[in-house]
UniProtKB/Swiss-Prot annotation:
Protease inhibitor that may play a role in the regulation of protease activities during hematopoiesis and apoptosis induced by TNF. May regulate protease activities in the cytoplasm and in the nucleus. Keywords: Cytoplasm, Nucleus, Protease inhibitor, Serine protease inhibitor. The lineage of its organism: Eukaryota, Metazoa, Chordata, Craniata, Vertebrata. PANTHER family: SERINE PROTEASE INHIBITOR, SERPIN, SERPIN B10. It holds the Pfam family Serpin. One of its GO terms (molecular function) is serine-type endopeptidase inhibitor activity. SUPFAM superfamilies: Serpins. This is Serpin B10. The gene is SERPINB10.
Length: 397
């Protein structure tokens, strides 16, 4: 399980940096866990270089140095240093079970499915394995003869799976008669804070987008005993907000400088994030916390991003090797669609009834102010595994 959580978190940071290249000044919100789980279903049916490339991008490769090797050596290393597939899939099965069995205080709804053109039938063994490890059932559909009808059916299924929170995942031109295989992944998260904000303390305040521009936001406020941590380079402060039952928590990384987010994003690595957010770096303080209310709904067509990260063969009709999935040649991944929804408010990540539990600490604690009034990074983390379920950047109200 440690290997999988590390893989997901490494993928989260690499993927976020790639997204940031074309999203300057924009909010980012995605689920590295969701993307990894959905792509792992595809990876289950790949072979050869297609499998090696996917393993590298998803951080399933045990030897990350291979990315710096010459092409011939890189291919050899990638093929022989991948973690055992059965171990990876078994860990996904365990992680999915862990997350879904989390306390009633948090609800995570996912819509995760592969849709393949019906003239490219799936192997029976592949269908069985996807159901065993991921609890999902790939669908054979008529892209050739009824592509738009299939698009509407996919959107309807996603909407139902996410309790109406994720609408129109696939836009009008998302599929056509040439589509061979589409992967959809949508997530909706709802949680209740351990310590809730009082609605009457929420007031309008300025959020500094940069040193010269501000926008008004509804700023929530609380004074509570919370865990904080400090980052020396680049200078930043972090804070952990638990959800009820403490299975999950929100981690916020706030640069000291209003314009410091770019430097923080460039500096962050898996090793540094693990160190910054480890239990022994946390300090319990009396915190005056100011945090904006916000709602993010982001949709990503992942084909270009994933291709640029190194898994181009899967999207190439002449190079893709999905022989573990189907006997038909020329099967390739046409697109990957991902959409996430989150709302941060006084009660939690979506308005819901709930009462916060009080932790009594009979000692004098340092008092600090944590004022999230300028761009910051945030993560929703599964605490038992330390896996990042959601990754976000809030910089534009």
């Amino acid at each position: 399980m440690d290997f999988l959580a590390k893989s997901i978190n490494q993928f989260a940071l690499e993927f976020s940096k790639k997204l940031a290249e074309s999203a300057e000044g924009k909010n980012i919100f995605f689920s590295p866990w969701g993307i990894s789980a959905s792509l792992a279903m595809v990876y289950l049916g790949t072979k050869g270089t297609t499998a090696a490339q996917m393993a590298q991008v998803l951080q399933f490769s045990r030897d990350q140095d291979s990315k710096f090797c010459p092409d011939s050596e890189k291919k050899r290393k990638m093929e022989f240093n991948v973690g055992k597939p059965e171990e990876i899939y078994s860990d996904f099965q365990t992680l999915i079970s862990e997350i879904n069995s989390s306390s009633h205080a948090c609800i995570l709804k996912t819509a995760n499915r592969i849709y393949g053109e019906k003239t490219f039938p799936f192997h029976k063994k592949y269908l069985e394995d996807v159901k065993t490890y991921f609890g999902a059932e790939p669908q054979s559909v008529n892209f050739i003869g009824a592509s738009d009808q299939i698009r509407k059916e996919i959107n309807s299924w996603v909407e139902k799976q996410t309790e109406g929170k994720i609408l129109n995942l696939l836009p009008d031109d998302a599929v056509d008669p040439t589509t061979r295989m589409v992967l959809v992944n949508a997530l909706y998260f709802k949680g209740v804070w351990e310590h809730q904000f009082l609605v009457q303390n929420t007031t309008e305040k300025s959020f500094k987008i940069n040193k010269t521009t501000s926008k008004p936001v509804q700023m929530m406020s609380m004074k509570e005993k919370l865990q904080v941590f400090y980052i020396e380079s680049p200078q930043a402060m972090g804070l952990q907000l638990y959800y009820e039952s403490r299975d999950l928590s929100l981690l916020i990384l706030l640069p000291e400088d209003v314009d410091g987010l770019d430097q923080l994003e460039k500096t962050i690595t898996y090793e540094k994030l693990s160190e910054w957010t480890s239990a022994d770096m946390m300090e319990l303080c009396n915190v005056q916390l100011n945090l904006p209310k916000f709602k993010l709904e982001e949709t990503y067509d992942l084909k270009s991003t994933l291709s640029s990260m190194g898994m181009s063969d899967a999207f190439n009709q002449s190079k893709a090797d999905f022989s573990g999935m189907s006997s038909e040649r020329n099967l390739f991944l046409s697109n990957v669609f991902h959409k996430c929804f989150v709302e941060i408010n006084e009660q939690g990540t979506e308005a819901a009834a709930g009462t916060g539990s009080e932790v009594s600490v009979r000692m004098k604690l340092p008092s600090i102010e944590f004022n999230a009034d300028h761009p910051f990074l945030f993560f929703i983390r599964h605490n038992k595994t330390n896996g990042i379920l959601f990754y976000g950047r809030f910089c534009s109200p």
